[in-house]
A protein has these predicted regions:
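Short, cationic low-complexity segments
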Residues: 119-142
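Short acidic/polar alpha-helix capping motifs at helix-coil junctions
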Residues: 28-29, 123-125, 211-213
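A general structural signal for short secondary-structure boundary/capping elements
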Residues: 63-66, 121-123, 216-218
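Intrinsically disordered, charged low-complexity linkers and terminal tails
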Residues: 23, 87, 106, 138, ...
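Intrinsically disordered, low-complexity boundary segments flanking structured domains
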Residues: 61-62, 92-95, 123-131, 190
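Short, conserved, surface-exposed binding loops centered on an aromatic residue
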Residues: 96-98, 130-134, 162-164
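Amphipathic alpha-helical interaction surfaces in cytosolic regulatory modules
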Residues: 141-218
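Conserved beta-strand-loop-beta-strand hairpin that lines the nucleotide-binding pocket
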Residues: 1-118
Length: 218
C-alpha cells in the first residue's frame, strides 16, 4: 500500500486509537510470506505471537502484547476481524467483519486503567526478572472460524501445534469448542507432547466431552 493514517480520540473516560493503511491486508501478507493455506489460518498464527515476516526489523511480539495491554483491540483485514478484550480475557473472530481495504487497527483503553506494560510482559515471561516471551495462549475458537467448523482431524491438530515449540508454556483455550476428534486430540496432546517434552501444554475451559478426549490422548 501507499497510504496510512492514524487518529487519536480522548473522551472523558477512554483513549481511542485508529490506525489503517491501504495495503493487501495483514492476514494476506502473512499467508503469502509463510505459505499458509488461508487468511484465517494466518490470523491464528499471528495470534500465537513470535511471528514476523521481517525479523530484521521487529520480533513479532507487538500485536500479542499490544492486544493485551489495551482494553479493546480489534484488527480488521481480508474480510476477517481479530478481537481481544481485556475484561473477557478471550479472543474471537467476528461473524460479520468490517469490510476495509488494507488493514485497520482499533485500540481503546480506560483512562483509569492501572496495568503496565511490565505487568503484561511478566504475565507471559519466565519470571519477574526475565521478560523473555515464554508463555502464549491459543484460542481454539480462532481455528473454527465464525462458521463453527469442528476440530476433528490430525491435520488440524498439526496446524494448532505449529510453532508452539518456540514457547515453554502454552495455554490452549477450549472456550466455545463443543467437541474435538480423536485424531485432533492425539496429534496435539500425545504426538506433539512427546516430540516436544520441554513445552508444557495446559488445556482450559473444556467441557466434559472435550476433557475426556484430551485425557484419553494423554
Amino acid at each position: 500500500g501507499r497510504l496510512s493514517s492514524g487518529m487519536v480520540l480522548v473522551d472523558r473516560t477512554h483513549l481511542h486509537l485508529l490506525i489503517r493503511d491501504d495495503g493487501c491486508g495483514v492476514f494476506a501478507r502473512i499467508q503469502e510470506a509463510f505459505a499458509i493455506d488461508t487468511p484465517q489460518q494466518a490470523l491464528l498464527e499471528l495470534s500465537k505471537g513470535k511471528l514476523t515476516s521481517q525479523p530484521e526489523f521487529h520480533t513479532g511480539r507487538g500485536l500479542f502484547f499490544t492486544s493485551r495491554l489495551f482494553d479493546v483491540f480489534d484488527l480488521y483485514a481480508n474480510h476477517l476481524t481479530y478481537q481481544h478484550s481485556h475484561w473477557q480475557r478471550r479472543e474471537w473472530l467476528r461473524a460479520n467483519p468490517l469490510a476495509v481495504q488494507g488493514t485497520a487497527v482499533f485500540m481503546s483503553i480506560a483512562l483509569s486503567a492501572t496495568r503496565t506494560l511490565d505487568e503484561v510482559f511478566a504475565a507471559h515471561s519466565r519470571g519477574s526478572q526475565d521478560f523473555s516471551f515464554a508463555r502464549t495462549e491459543v484460542a481454539l475458537r480462532l481455528a473454527i472460524g465464525a462458521e463453527g467448523q469442528t476440530l476433528e482431524s490430525r491435520a488440524q491438530g498439526k496446524r494448532i501445534a505449529h510453532r508452539l515449540e518456540a514457547f515453554e508454556e502454552v495455554d490452549l483455550d477450549f472456550d466455545g469448542i463443543d467437541a474435538i476428534g480423536q485424531g485432533f486430540a492425539d496429534e496435539l496432546f500425545r504426538v506433539f507432547a512427546r516430540q516436544h517434552p520441554q513445552v508444557q501444554l495446559r488445556a482450559r475451559n473444556m467441557n466434559d466431552q472435550v476433557a475426556a478426549m484430551v485425557a484419553q490422548a494423554r
